[in-house]
């Protein structure tokens, strides 16, 4: 493989957001996330990828099958129950559940009429939380007894009823479709972002809504982690790469500008003060800082960042470089020698 120090510019020189702007609802089920600036086209790349992962790969809990006393299949009606079994199945599918168990759990609903039977009437079970207790399951007439058992599993995405049906189902077991995903809605839009005087950058705006079993912000974080994990297999090198050291080397094997002090750069007073306050003495110290690290420096803004990037570009340098064996043991002597030569 070619030198990593040369090719690292492929990813280290790309602009990245210093941080995300996240706005979360009080119940944490809705989040608006803004990432800017991004390289042109990266808004679509990231937004579409994260949306697909959010909707397909975040794990959750759902009912997989039910059994109702006196019912053999779903295409029937129950005496004293206003809804037929098909309607009850649809209502059960709408249950929003949170499970802290990886094993199948059983929920029991045992009720007597008359009246409206809700999810809150389901008997409490350890490790299972019902997030929409006001959901109506069915309506019972007077003197009607209704008993239903529901099996709850965990998984991801959508699983059809046929996949939830065991090979030898007990009499009266009705397998139902399971939508495990806790993510209800994901949308994104892309607009133009400004970076200095340039307007050819992307701003990614994502809105995520969940059923409450997971916060919208965490759902985005987990989807990004899934994406990262899948991409790792394509990276065929390790960081950092050791650079072979020559047996005899009287001169440094890096850009001599790295030995110059930052106060030799023609920077504004504000930028120079920020560098001094961060104890950045040599240009070699400066270029090893990432854009994010620089922007976290007190009083250091985008204007100062762009100013420094422009100066470094003129020296064929950039922020985020990796410089093996920096700083040299005799850096003060080497810097002085270079200054005399200049």
Swiss-Prot record:
GO terms for biological process? DNA-templated transcription
Q: Domain remarks in the entry?
A: The N-terminal domain is essential for RNAP assembly and basal transcription, whereas the C-terminal domain is involved in interaction with transcriptional regulators and with upstream promoter elements.
Map out region (Alpha N-terminal domain (alpha-NTD)) in residue numbers. Answer: 1-238
Family annotation (SUPFAM superfamilies): C-terminal domain of RNA polymerase alpha subunit, Insert subdomain of RNA polymerase alpha subunit, RBP11-like subunits of RNA polymerase
* Enzymatic class: transferase
Q: What is its EC number?
A: 2.7.7.6
Q: Does the keyword Transferase apply?
A: yes
GO CC, any one term: cytoplasm
Function comment: DNA-dependent RNA polymerase catalyzes the transcription of DNA into RNA using the four ribonucleoside triphosphates as substrates.
Q: Which residues cross the membrane?
A: none
Q: What binding partners and quaternary form does the record give?
A: Homodimer. The RNAP catalytic core consists of 2 alpha, 1 beta, 1 beta' and 1 omega subunit. When a sigma factor is associated with the core the holoenzyme is formed, which can initiate transcription.
Q: Which Gene3D superfamilies did the record assign? A: 5' to 3' exonuclease, C-terminal subdomain (1.10.150.20), DNA-directed RNA polymerase, insert domain (2.170.120.12), RNA polymerase, RBP11-like subunit (3.30.1360.10)
Entries under InterPro entries matching the protein: DNA-dir_RNA_pol_insert, DNA-dir_RNA_pol_RpoA/D/Rpb3, DNA-dir_RpoA, RBP11-like, RNAP_asu_C, RNApol_insert_sf
Sorted alphabetically, the keyword list is: DNA-directed RNA polymerase, Nucleotidyltransferase, Transcription, Transferase
Q: Which HAMAP family match?
A: RNApol_bact_RpoA (MF_00059)
Extract one GO molecular function annotation from the record: DNA binding
**Could you tell me which residues belong to the region Alpha C-terminal domain (alpha-CTD)?**
254-342
| Catalyzed reactions per annotation | RNA(n) + a ribonucleoside 5'-triphosphate = RNA(n+1) + diphosphate
- One Pfam family named in its UniProt record: RNA_pol_A_bac
Q: Which protein are we looking at?
A: DNA-directed RNA polymerase subunit alpha
Concerning its family, UniProt says: Belongs to the RNA polymerase alpha chain family.
């Amino acid at each position: 493989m070619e030198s990593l120090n040369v090719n690292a510019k492929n990813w280290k020189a790309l602009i990245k957001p210093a941080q995300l702007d996240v706005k979360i609802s009080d119940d944490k089920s809705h989040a608006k996330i803004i990432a800017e600036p991004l390289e042109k086209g990266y808004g679509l790349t990231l937004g579409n990828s994260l949306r697909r992962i959010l909707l397909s790969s975040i794990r959750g809990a759902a009912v997989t099958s039910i059994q109702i006393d006196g019912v053999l299949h779903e295409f029937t009606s129950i005496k004293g129950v206003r809804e037929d079994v098909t309607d009850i199945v649809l209502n059960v599918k709408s249950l929003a559940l949170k499970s802290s168990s990886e094993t199948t759990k059983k929920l029991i609903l045992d009720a007597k009429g008359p009246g409206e039977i809700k999810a809150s009437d389901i008997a409490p079970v350890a490790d299972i939380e019902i997030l929409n207790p006001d959901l109506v399951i069915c309506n019972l007439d007077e003197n009607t007894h209704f008993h239903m058992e529901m099996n709850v599993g965990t998984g991801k995405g959508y699983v059809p009823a046929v996949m939830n049906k065991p090979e030898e189902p007990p009499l009266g077991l009705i397998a139902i479709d399971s939508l495990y995903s806790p993510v209800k809605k994901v949308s994104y839009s892309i607009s133009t972002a400004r970076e200095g005087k340039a307007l050819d950058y992307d701003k990614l705006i994502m809105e995520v809504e969940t059923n409450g079993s997971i916060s919208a912000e965490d759902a985005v974080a987990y989807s990004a982690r899934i994406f990262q994990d899948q991409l790792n297999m394509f990276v065929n090198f390790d960081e950092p790469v050791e650079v072979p050291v020559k047996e005899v080397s009287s001169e440094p094997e890096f850009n001599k500008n790295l030995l110059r002090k930052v106060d030799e750069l023609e920077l504004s007073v504000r930028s120079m003060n920020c560098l001094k306050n961060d104890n950045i003495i040599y240009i070699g110290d400066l270029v090893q800082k990432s854009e994010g690290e620089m922007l976290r420096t007190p009083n250091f803004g985008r204007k100062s960042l762009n100013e420094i990037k422009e100066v470094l570009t003129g020296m064929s340098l950039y922020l985020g470089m990796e410089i093996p064996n920096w700083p040299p043991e005799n850096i003060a002597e080497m810097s002085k020698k270079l200054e005399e030569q200049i």
